[in-house]
Amino acid sequence: MSASRWIHLDDVKIIKETDKAFLIEIEEGEFWIPRNQVSDPDDYSEGDEGASMSISEWIAAEKGIA
């Protein structure tokens, strides 16, 4: 994914984590974000609050975040 552009999200709450995705809560609402669309997904865990997360520009557009 080195060619991807990233969208930076602040104040992210990780509601749920699976092997494939994170359920996050941000100001715009709740969204399932695939782990492969998150920069450094191993840095996040279920229950994290106030996190800064970078997601691919593509998934942000797909989810209506960007």
Predicted regions, residues:
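Catalytic phosphate/metal-binding cores of nucleic-acid and nucleotide-processing enzymes, i.e., regions
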Residues: M1-A66
